[in-house]
Structures are given as C-alpha cells and as structure tokens.
Amino acid sequence: MSNKAKKISWTAALVAAGLYAAPAASEVRLMSYNIHHCAGADKRVDVRRVAEAISREKPDFVGLNEVDQCALRSHGIDMPEELGRLTGLHATFAQAIPLQGGGYGNAVLSREKPLSVLRVPLPGREPRVLLLCEFADFWFGTAHFALQETNRLETVEIIRRVVNEKAASKPMFITGDWNCQPESAPIASLRTFMAIISNEKCRTFHGFKKHAPDTVSCIDYIAVDRGAAARVKVKESHVTPDEMTSDHNPIVVTIDLTKGPGHLH
C-alpha cells in the first residue's frame, strides 16, 4: 500500500471512530458603516436612530467610521459607549483627532469582548486611524482612508505591514470607508494581499442626495486577508439603502468561517 493510500485509510479509520473532526465552520455577520457622527439628513444628531439601523441588520461585528466621543457638536455624547449600550454589543473606540473637547475616530462594536486592541495612525491632512480588535478566531477592524490619493496609497502599505505581521496566526477582516472606487490604484494595490468580500456594485455613499439608479459610488468595503480567504465562504452580501440616517449606506456580509484544519480530540 502506498503512503498516500495509508494516509487516506488512516483518516477514514479516525473518522469512523469519531476521533477526527472535519474543519468546523461558524456563521458570522460583518458590517461596515460610516455614521457621519450620527447626524442625519435632517442635520439632527440621533444616536438611537443609528443604533436602530445597526440592530436591524443583526450584525456580530461592526466597523464604524466618523464617530464622535464627547464632542461639543454632538452634545457631549459618548457615541461608542451609547451605541454599544443600545445595540447590546461591546464598544471599542480609537481616536484619530481631538475634537471640541472630545475625540473623533473609529469604533468597533462586537458580540465578543476583544482580547487585545491595536491602534495604528494613518496619514492624511486630517489624521486617520486603523482600529483592530483581536478576538478568539480572528482580527476585526476598521480604517477610514484620507481624501488624498497619495495618503491612501501610503495607508495601503501600512495595512500591508500590519496584515503581514498579525494575520499569520488568525484571519484578519478590515472594513471601512476607504474613499476610493473599486477600480482605483489604492484598491488595486490592496487586492494583492486582501480579498474584498462585500458587494462592490452597489452605492455605499449618497451624500444625502438623490442619484440615478445606474450610477454607483462604492467607497466602503469589507475585506479579509488573502491568506485566510479560502476559509471564508460568503453566504450573502448587501448594501441597505438609507438616505436619512447617514450620508453612507450600511454594508453587510454574512460568511461561514472555517475555524481551522481537522484535528485529533
């Protein structure tokens, strides 16, 4: 009997004996949302309205951009804490800049409490930040790219270094408002080490304006590092049209994540 045949026979025996487990998959619902500091089309800051928009999607992990924390323009509300309370999720905040007595940046809402948190400064005329949270099975985070192309290209290279360093042992999902279209140079560069799993053919940014149905402005994304892409099966991906709550639409991806190779118990 060849070595290959022996290996197949041994694996079959383990399966029959209940000692070998096939890779387990778990369903995870991911969301990305630029919330425009909870200021809607009516210019009213309404945290509850944003929380309801999030809760309707029933996400497990949410990356939020343009989040105020205790800033004067949003009535001193600690938005990460309040959104966490209203959605029943853990809240983690990373400040990009100080703002009116408080801060402004990104947040992650999560069903699980993070094991660790990484904050990485990103370039821009207005400084930006990458927020990454480590969980039991993967990293999840969000980045808000700058408006300038050169800064966006620099940001992609910073993210590449982080992925190379941190994604060796766990998959890494990065979401966010990246301020560039799918055919842009920064996205082309990012695709060399990340696989975009969100819908790229739907409008994610509307700017509180009506648009022709055949025009698309996709600048918000959900992606996974290419090293883990084979372990991710996209079950469903959509963008929810909402021209009241924020100037961006929420984007959602439901995946099956294979936790790892078969193993002996």
Where are these regions (language model features)?
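N-terminal, active-site-proximal structural segment of metallo-dependent hydrolase catalytic domains
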Residues: 2-14, 18-86, 98-102, 158, ...
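Active-site metal-binding loops of divalent metal-dependent hydrolases
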Residues: 33-35, 67, 143-145, 176-178, ...
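Metal-dependent phosphoester-hydrolase catalytic domains
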Residues: 119, 150-151, 157, 161-173, ...
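Surface-exposed cleft-lining segments at the edges of enzyme active sites
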Residues: 37-39, 118-119, 143-149
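Structured beta-strand-rich core segments of catalytic domains in phosphoester-bond hydrolases
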Residues: 27, 42-43, 67-139, 231-241
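Sec-exported extracytoplasmic/periplasmic mature domains
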Residues: 55-59, 84-88, 92, 114, ...
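Structural recognition of the beta-strand scaffold that forms the well-ordered cores
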Residues: 31-32, 61-65, 108, 132, ...
